[in-house]
From Swiss-Prot:
One of its GO terms (biological process) is negative regulation of DNA-templated transcription. This is Trp operon repressor. One of its GO terms (cellular component) is cytoplasm. The gene is trpR. Gene3D superfamilies: TrpR-like (1.10.1270.10). GO terms for molecular function: DNA-binding transcription factor activity; sequence-specific DNA binding. The keyword Repressor applies. HAMAP family: Trp_repressor. Pfam families: Trp_repressor. Belongs to the TrpR family.
């Protein structure tokens, strides 16, 4: 196992700060009802479609009615994308998972 160089750590920190800056910008855009135009500016149509697909993946994984292979066929997503979603969901904080269940599966009740 190799250690990251200080440069790599610095780059990682810079990227993290850029991500936090984007999140803050998005929060402000929501507060000012500019979130849709901001997201359309920042994301390509393909990226917006990919985010929609990821929401569906999480929703279906939470629902638990389809296998990952069935999800792949249903959504046209790669099995690696579905597996990453599954692994991320498993490591998500309990509060987030509960919120996602309440929010995404509300129509099931």
């Amino acid at each position: 196992m190799t250690q990251q160089s200080p440069y790599s750590a610095a780059v990682a920190e810079q990227r993290h700060q850029e991500w936090l800056r984007f999140v803050a910008l998005l929060q402000q855009a929501y507060a000012e009802d500019l979130h849709l135009p901001l997201l359309q500016l920042m994301l390509t149509p393909d990226e917006r479609e990919a985010l929609g697909t990821r929401v569906r993946i999480i929703e279906e994984l939470l629902r638990g009615e389809m296998s990952q292979r069935e999800l792949k066929n249903e959504l046209g997503a790669g099995i690696a994308t579905i597996t990453r979603g599954s692994n991320s969901l498993k490591s998500a904080p309990v509060e987030l998972r509960q919120w996602l269940e309440q929010t995404l599966l509300a129509s099931d009740k």
